[in-house]
Amino acid sequence: MPPISWPTGTAPGVNPTETGGRLINAIAERAPAGSRSEIVWRRVAGLIARFTTTQTAIRGALLVGSVLYVVSGNRVYSITSSYVVTELTGTVGGSGPVTMARNMKAPVPDVLIVHSGGMSQINISGASVAVFSDGDLPSVNSICWVDGYFIVTAESGLAYQSGLNDTTFASVDRTTAEADPDGLYRAIASGSDLILMGTASLEFYANAGNPTAFAFNRSVVVPIGLKAPYAVAGFEPGFADTVIFVANDNTVRRLQGYEPAPISGPDLNRLIEAVTNPAELVAWVYQAAGHAYWVLSGPGWSTTFRPAAGTSARAMVFPIGAAATASPPGASGSPSTSKAARRSS
């Protein structure tokens, strides 16, 4: 009898008669030479709870040296490598996910946070967080750091740079992403590139060392945009792949140089299209057992991509919002606490 064709990815189809099979909490690997099968199936990495905060949800985190700074609810916590948790004094405004960045100021770096209510600054030496404001900045919606500069973006399409390893901004040190009148969702740094991401275009900038105004010059424009502010990941330090994002055409795309190559299939494209509030799409990354993973979570579902293998799997164990809260599957506890976890291979 013919061998059973086991799936190597997730392709459920619209109805059972067209399904290509599904991998749930599992990945397919090519077997070593001489094995009885060309493919082996392994479970995906799990989660181990490591610390608990007193707030309801983790909104964002940033590693500064060996200390992790976590925004949870309206509080900020520092977590050491031995999982000692310290609550910083002060609060963070806004709601929902935040973006965070640090510079290379010596001996103590600056850390800035952008949230829906404005900006905040972490004082590492003082173990505190407070409102950050600069009269030269409008209302901003994201932050990143590249080549010594904080870069913040505004929905209007403006991007501002800070002083070199400083938190001061000048109204003239800015540029406008004007290849398309789509505004800006995010600024991210990928290698030596600054990428300004609008709803219908990506603009790549390179550091030209301009002595006045914006230090970066635009180099490449890609006519594909970002569907939602938090639907992009892969630019994080140490991630062994490249930037992957949900595009404005409801596909998942992987940057190969300046080419955003689609990597999602029709099933996931339909799932993305059905999301009524794109802000619920959250992407994140992790690495385990030598594999790099990119995860997209929507309302009630998560899908994992292994970019190097070109395969995907469905992660059914995550509760709604797991990508944003980093809560372990099935985590228990009172509603007033939030648990954070690390991957286990």
What are the language-model segments listed below?
Residues 105, 110-112, 133-134, 185-345:
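Beta-sheet-dominated scaffold domains
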Residues 79-113:
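A broadly used, surface-exposed interaction patch
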Residues 1-86, 139-205, 209-210, 281-284, ...:
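N-terminal beta-propeller domains
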Residues 50-54, 89-94, 132-137, 175-179, ...:
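Surface loop/turn motifs at the tips and blade-to-blade linkers of beta-strand repeat domains
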Residues 101-133, 152:
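Hydrophobic or amphipathic alpha-helical targeting/insertion segments
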Residues 82, 116-118, 124-127, 146-147, ...:
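Acidic/polar residues in short coil/turn loops that connect beta-strands
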Residues 75, 118-120, 201, 251:
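A short loop-to-beta-strand structural motif that recurs across blades of beta-propeller domains
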Residues 87, 124-135, 167-172, 211-218:
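A short alpha->loop->secondary-structure connector
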